[in-house]
Amino acid sequence: MDFTYSEEQEAVRQLAGQIFTDRVTHERLKQLEAEAGDEGPFDRALWKELADAGLLGIHLSEDVGGAGLDFVAACLVIEAAGRTAAYVPVVETMVYGAEPIARFGTDAQRKTWLAGVAAGETVLTAALAELNGEVILPGGTEPATTATAQADGSWSLTGTKACVPAALVADAILVPAQCKAADGTVTGLGVFIVDPKATGVTLTRQSTTTGRPEAIVELADVHVPTDGLLGEGVDGAGVVNAITEFATTALCILEAGACAAALELTAEYTKTRVQFEKPIATFQAVGQRAADAYVDTEAIRLTAWQAASRLASGLPAASEIAVAKFWAAEGGQRVVHAASHLHGGVGVDRDYPLHRYFLLTRQIELTLGSANESLRRLGRILADEPV
């Protein structure tokens, strides 16, 4: 892997960093939290600015209003969002939704949905968790939701999904389902583009660790037109696998940004906090704890970017993604615990920004597979490889 950025990628990194740093302040986040309704905090002004700067469609093709760059460019935007804990659904829209439509969608689907993403007019997400808490993962849980083919070529979807991020503000939700013929015969997996305002769709708000609400999505004989099935003649299982892989990697990148920011806050605090007439950063125990957190942060960053680089290059990345998610889950919680500990009482003060990184990291830890689940996935991959 080449760890240097191209000129275009460096420009994206700098632009995204500047916008997020300038617009996402502690005071702005507190304001959004205080004004949030049932849909949760959503910085629509920032969302528009990201669109105007061309960042929301940075990884989309130029024919739909994008910049024509790759998944790495999208991850640079996501990492900047993680560093500021911004209230914008960049992971959900750019990766859960737009990435699979860009890769597998028909020309009509791409033009219908991706132009709106690039313009900041469309929010997308995907429903990857079952009601019982099981997550649709490669080689793991199959979706319980069913899609029954109708005589006119349309589909009828029935089932329930849980913990769907950004569902309350989404314009469309990608829903994996077991496809069935009219006689009930299972014909394979499919991913369907569902309008959350369609008849038969019920959204129930779910509170989360971060305060960014998710939703239970209930589907009761929801009519989905023929062109609502993502792609044409594509392998549905492959689409589901791709969504999960890209989404998991994006969360690891988001985590890398959050942990880096938490560590920077900690470094600054320990340099200015004086005890026994010395900055506590000069104490050996403090330095050792911070050094351990730095090692974890670098491991999270490097493994996440390795996974992102392989995905962007079209290379197999299942084992790299499992390793990255393990580090994001296991290492991430160590980083934010160390950061909170080294801050003392300030670390748990909600008037101080550290708590947002703590909560974001803990939520990512258990999203799309915990550390143990990631190790199990890696074990299955290694066991299947010929010696």
Protein language model regions, located:
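Internal helix-loop-helix
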Residues: 51-111, 115-120, 164-172
